[in-house]
């Protein structure tokens, strides 16, 4: 059973029932909706389609709403676009002007107050780069250090800067409330720089009936990298959004930062998603490049919870083939990774009772050569903690809550299973043993390790470990 989960962005190439069904059967676990594009009406149709397909297939396909995030853009040019040469002087202004080869307006009205001489401004995903020379009233006077073409409404970024404007835009607030109304499972928060950004979204979710929606913080700038521990402490995990991250920090740093962030999330028991350009060539081609295969395999080898498809599944020619390729690469890499040796050689210091129980479950499962670890969980927390140890043993996550059933689809190594509510733990374990036997085709003599807690509807009360022989 594949342990690494697959997230697919839904767009024109995949927003029909036949293709989406094939993607789910090929291995898609989570459907991502990119709210940087499309209207609420368009996204409502996608959500309805995802729900229809997952119900038809009886699969726990989760829905992830990816916010637009704080948006900084240049405005328009009289000619639509201009060419800027390296060494040219160019002005960005918060005033309203008609753009030309020397000046353009920006949509962020605090820009002249946030920037200072020496700061870097990049436009169009780093394709054109400027260094601030002087702030003169409402104007930011710069020198072009990497020439190129500027065109209308291209995005801007400011490496190593945290802007002073509010984190949550009115558009993001509207999108998140829309997501709550339509039952999304995760919100991916773009350009998170600090724990306060996460807390702002948590407050909005809780105030509008979305307390059961989990936040994934997208790490896309230096501040996010530096503050990743406090960010993770306040959300369910992170997405390593390598596209914008490679603009905000030197691109040569991205691989080592990716490994560092993956390791931190694993140790903290948080989900980590590796994203952007993983199989980019499959937008046009039916097979991935060798470099792309290595990229996906290395992320899997490092222990990422999920790998993600963006344009490949949203707008590419081969959305189903992209999912199949991703799944094949992940499965092969997992089969050739010694998870047992990794677990046994990793030093462990328990943080609390639940963490110690989760570690003990993994250790016991290895000792008795168990075919599965079965976690009966109200909130899914115990299953996530067991998952963090990247055990070689299959993990079955049993829950009575459909929301948790879908949420576990983003947890490494966990196969989510829906169960009925049971009158006692003994009855629950009996059902869990029976269901696991069917799912994994267990044979007489096979061992499984079960863990759970008292049947009282509270999360975090896991206190029992049991070995069962089929």
Language model features with spans:
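Non-catalytic helical/linker scaffolds that mediate oligomerization, partner binding
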Residues: 1-470
């Amino acid at each position: 059973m594949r342990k690494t989960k697959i997230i697919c962005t839904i767009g024109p190439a995949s927003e029909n029932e036949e293709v989406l069904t094939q993607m789910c059967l090929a291995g898609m676990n989570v459907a991502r909706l990119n709210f940087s594009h499309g209207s609420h009406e368009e996204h409502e149709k996608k959500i309805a389609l995802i729900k229809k397909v997952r119900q038809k297939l009886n699969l726990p396909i989760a829905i992830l709403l990816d916010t637009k995030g704080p948006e900084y853009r240049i405005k328009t040019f009289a000619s639509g676009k201009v060419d800027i040469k390296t060494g040219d002087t160019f002005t960005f202004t918060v005033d309203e002007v008609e753009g030309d080869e020397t000046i353009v307006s920006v949509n962020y009205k605090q820009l002249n107050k946030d920037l200072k001489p020496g700061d870097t401004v990049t436009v169009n995903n780093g394709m054109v780069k400027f260094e601030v020379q002087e702030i003169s009233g409402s104007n930011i006077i710069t020198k072009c250090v990497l020439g190129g073409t500027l065109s209308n409404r291209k995005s801007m970024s400011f490496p190593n800067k945290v802007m002073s404007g509010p984190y949550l835009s009115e558009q993001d607030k509207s999108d998140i409330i829309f997501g709550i109304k339509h039952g999304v499972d995760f919100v991916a928060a773009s350009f998170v720089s600090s724990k306060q950004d996460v807390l702002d979204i948590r407050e909005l979710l809780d105030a509008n009936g979305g307390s059961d929606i989990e936040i994934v913080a997208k790490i896309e700038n230096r501040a996010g990298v530096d503050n990743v521990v406090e960010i993770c402490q306040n959300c369910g995990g992170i997405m390593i959004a390598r596209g914008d991250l490679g603009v905000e920090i030197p691109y040569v740093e991205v691989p080592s930062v990716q490994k560092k962030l993956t390791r931190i999330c694993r140790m903290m028991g948080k989900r980590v998603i590796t994203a952007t350009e993983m199989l980019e060539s499959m937008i046009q081609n039916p097979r991935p490049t060798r470099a792309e295969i290595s990229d996906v395999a290395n992320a899997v080898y490092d222990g990422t919870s999920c790998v993600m498809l963006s344009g490949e599944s949203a707008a590419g020619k081969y959305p189903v083939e992209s999912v199949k390729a991703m799944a094949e690469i992940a499965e092969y890499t997992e089969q050739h990774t010694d998870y047992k040796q990794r677990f046994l050689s990793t030093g462990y210091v328990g943080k609390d009772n639940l963490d110690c129980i989760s570690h003990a479950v993994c250790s016991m499962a290895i000792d008795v050569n168990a075919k599965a670890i079965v976690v009966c969980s109200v909130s899914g927390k115990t299953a996530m903690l067991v998952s963090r140890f990247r055990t070689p043993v299959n993990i079955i996550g049993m829950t009575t809550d459909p929301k948790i059933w879908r949420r576990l689809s983003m947890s490494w190594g966990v196969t989510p299973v829906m169960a009925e509510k049971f009158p006692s733990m003994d009855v629950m374990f009996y059902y869990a043993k029976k269901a696991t036997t069917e799912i994994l085709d267990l044979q007489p003599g096979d061992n499984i390790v079960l863990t759970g807690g008292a049947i009282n509807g509270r999360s975090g009360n896991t206190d029992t470990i049991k070995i069962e022989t089929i």
